Amino acid sequence: MVYAFNWKKLSISAALGYRWDGKRCRLWFQTQPGSYNDERLIAFVRDLKKHLRGQAAILIWDGLPAHKSRKMKQYLESQRSWLEVETLPGYSPDLNPVEDLWSNIKGQELANRCVAGLGEAEDGVCSGMDRVRQSMLPFSFLHHAGLFF
């Protein structure tokens, strides 16, 4: 069997947004071919700002090199009026609710699949994101990370 698909060609960025009172959770995501770099992540944060409609937010993310670049740091500094950024300790995926999101989708929509191309892989990801959005799973991801209300 010849299998030419390479997972490194599809990247996904996601944000889980929790209200301070625990009444609502929102999920935003973006897929793209290739890898994320600081420019693409800045565009994702800009899109996130539009969705939040001026509401203040705390962004908690891991140590991906693009999160720590000089360009990203300068951009985040310019967004301090609405965005506070906290970085998770190194090697701590158990503290990141988005890691549980990835695990859930990989274990459901992407499990045991031999996709023919990026479009099919992206369809599986989008289907999984829709399923998670319509459930209470994001709250379980938060609880698993020890960050429950």
Task: Describe these PLM feature segments.
Residues 17-21, 64-67, 91-93, 147:
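Short, solvent-exposed loop/turn segments at secondary-structure junctions
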Residues 1-55:
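Electropositive, glycine- and tryptophan-enriched low-complexity nucleic-acid-binding patches
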Residues 28-29, 87, 109:
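Structural signal for conserved beta-strand scaffold positions within catalytic alpha/beta enzyme cores
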Residues 45, 55-67, 96:
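Acidic/histidine-rich, metal-coordinating catalytic segments
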Residues 70-74:
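Distinct, well-ordered alpha-helical segments
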Residues 58-63, 86-89, 142-143:
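Short beta-strand segments
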Residues 1-3, 77-100, 113-114:
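RNase H-like polynucleotidyl transferase catalytic core
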Residues 98-149:
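C-terminal anion-handling pockets and recognition modules
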